[in-house]
Amino acid sequence: MEPQEVAAAAGVHPIELCVYSILSNNLDGIYQSVNDLRESQALLVVRLKQIRNLLKEEQEYYNEEEGLGVERERLEELELRVEKLTQKYKKLLADCV
């Protein structure tokens, strides 16, 4: 069937049929582009979640290290105290003998 026959059978003017055909092709392209964007967006969201989780883990690691820093300082203070007490006991032992 010729386009004019199709247009006449449907009661549509040939120019309307051409305009519909052009718009239909553009709409299909737009629909495909929107679907591609949605897929890209979904992939980006997944990747952002992965990055966020990695950053959280790294932050927890650094926070833990800072907490260990306090414990290290306390341990160093205890080592100094033990060293001073050891020297004091050695001196007392030397004085007693």
UniProtKB/Swiss-Prot annotation:
Compartment annotation: Endosome
Coiled-coil features, chain-numbered ranges: 45-97
Entry's transmembrane regions: none
Record keywords, A-Z: Coiled coil, Endosome, Transport
Signal peptide: none
GO cellular component terms given for this protein: endosome
Family, per entry: Belongs to the SNAPIN family.
Role played: Component of the biogenesis of lysosome-related organelles complex-1 (BLOC-1), a complex involved in endosomal cargo sorting.
Subunit architecture: Component of the biogenesis of lysosome-related organelles complex-1 (BLOC-1).
Protein name: Biogenesis of lysosome-related organelles complex 1 subunit SNN1
Record gene name: SNN1
